Amino acid sequence: EKLEAAVSIGLSNVCRGAASFAAGFEEARHALLGTTVLKGTPGVMAYEELGPYKYLLRMPFDGGVRDAHRDAVARIAEYDRQRSTALLRTLEEFLRRRGSIGATAEALYVHPNTLRQRLRRIGELSGLDLRKDDWLMVEIAVKMVRLQEALGPGERREPK
């Protein structure tokens, strides 16, 4: 009988002596979490690949950081969970491609009109206006929601 297992690995920066082991462990743990949040699949990730997540993971975080953008993105994530849709992924790709309908539609393998319909639905659900809202705030909110999903409900992170 052949068993298949999915393995994720988080890599820290090089530790130079016992004094840096605790920091190295935290970096590796954060990189491991990054495989879930950034890649969405098991794999290998180095701490340096985390980008802005390095900073978000260092903040005290219990999901209680609330603002209108985070609440809006959380509504999209909840809608996706309940209906097995991918509106949050659509929003992420749209932001990643700096609002390009063509590039986002291509990345998602959908027709541009389908993308426009999804963006309208995102606006209806969340109250976000992607023509006016601060995209950086929306991007940070998306990352915070993804981190909370990866940490699981009710898990609390203390500052390190």
Predicted regions and their residues:
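Cytosolic nucleotide-utilizing catalytic cores of signal-transduction proteins
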Residues: E1-K160
